[in-house]
C-alpha cells in the first residue's frame, strides 16, 4: 500500500515538473494511462489515482471518452476547500464577505490601470440592464456577472480565482441571496447607485470614489443579510 502511495505521488511530481518546465501547457492532452504507466514504471492504478487527485485539484480535466487535459483551473480546488470549511462551520458568511470586500477593493484599484474600454463599456451595459430588469433571477445573474467583470478587469488571476471561489460558496449555501437582496425596488435602487458610482469612478480613474462605492455596497448587503439571519432566530 505504501509503495503504491509513493508511486502515485511520483506520477504527480512528474507532471508537476513537466508543467513547471513549460513542456505541458493548458489545453494539451495527457498520454494514455498505459503509456504513462510504462514510461514511469508504475501500475495503472497508481496512474489513475494520480489523475484523480490532479482532477480534484484543478490541474487537469478528465473528459469521458476524450481523455485528460491540462487545465490548471486551481479555482476549482480553492472553491471546494472553502465550501467544505463553510459546511463544517470553520468559516461563516461574515468572514467570506470581509474577504470579498477586500479583494473587490483591490480589484477596483487594479482595474483602474488594467481595464480596457471594452470591459468598462460592458460593465456599464450590465448596470443599465439591472436598472431596467424586473426579473429577480435575471437581476441576480446580472449582478454576479458585473462583479465577475470587475474582478476580471483587474488583470490579476489570483484576485479573480479567489473572488470566484467566494461566489461559489455563497451560491452553494445561500441559494437565493442575490435575488433576495435585489427583490425590493428600494434595495435594488440603492445597490445600483453603488454600481453606477463604481463604474463612473473606473472611467474617471477616481480611486476614492470607487472605494467609497464598494464600501457602501457591502454595508448594504451585510445589513440585508443580518436582517435575514435575525428572522431565522
Describe the function of each predicted region.
Residues 32, 155-157, 205-207:
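Short loop-to-helix capping motifs
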Residues 131, 169-233:
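C-terminal all-alpha effector/ligand-binding and dimerization domain
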Residues 73-149, 186-212:
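All-alpha effector-binding/dimerization core of bacterial HTH-type transcriptional repressors
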Residues 3, 48, 115-117, 142-143, ...:
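Juxtamembrane/interface motifs at transmembrane-helix termini
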Residues 16, 20-21, 151, 199, ...:
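Solvent-exposed, non-membrane alpha-helical residues enriched in polar/charged side chains
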Residues 160-170:
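Short, charge-rich, low-complexity alpha-helical interaction segments
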Amino acid at each position: 500500500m505504501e509503495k503504491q502511495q509513493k508511486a502515485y505521488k511520483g506520477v504527480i511530481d512528474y507532471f508537476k515538473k513537466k508543467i513547471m518546465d513549460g513542456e505541458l501547457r493548458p489545453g494539451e492532452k495527457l498520454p494514455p494511462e498505459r503509456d504513462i504507466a510504462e514510461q514511469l514504471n508504475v501500475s495503472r492504478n497508481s496512474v489513475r489515482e494520480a489523475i484523480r487527485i490532479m482532477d480534484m485539484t484543478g490541474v487537469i480535466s478528465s473528459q469521458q471518452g476524450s481523455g485528460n487535459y491540462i487545465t490548471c483551473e486551481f479555482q476549482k480546488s480553492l472553491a471546494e476547500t472553502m465550501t467544505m470549511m463553510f459546511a463544517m462551520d470553520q468559516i461563516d458568511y461574515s468572514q467570506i464577505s470581509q474577504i470579498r470586500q477586500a479583494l473587490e477593493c483591490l480589484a477596483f484599484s487594479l482595474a483602474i490601470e488594467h481595464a480596457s474600454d471594452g470591459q468598462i463599456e460592458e460593465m456599464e451595459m450590465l448596470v443599465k440592464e439591472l436598472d431596467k430588469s424586473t426579473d429577480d433571477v435575471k437581476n441576480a445573474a446580472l449582478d454576479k456577472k458585473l462583479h465577475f467583470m470587475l474582478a476580471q478587469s483587474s488583470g490579476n488571476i489570483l484576485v479573480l480565482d479567489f473572488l470566484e471561489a467566494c461566489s461559489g460558496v455563497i451560491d452553494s449555501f445561500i441559494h437565493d441571496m442575490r435575488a433576495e437582496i435585489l427583490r425590493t425596488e428600494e434595495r435594488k435602487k440603492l445597490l445600483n447607485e453603488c454600481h453606477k458610482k463604481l463604474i463612473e469612478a473606473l472611467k474617471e480613474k477616481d480611486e476614492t470614489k470607487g472605494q467609497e462605492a464598494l464600501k457602501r455596497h457591502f454595508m448594504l448587503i451585510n445589513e440585508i443579510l443580518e436582517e435575514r439571519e435575525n428572522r431565522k432566530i
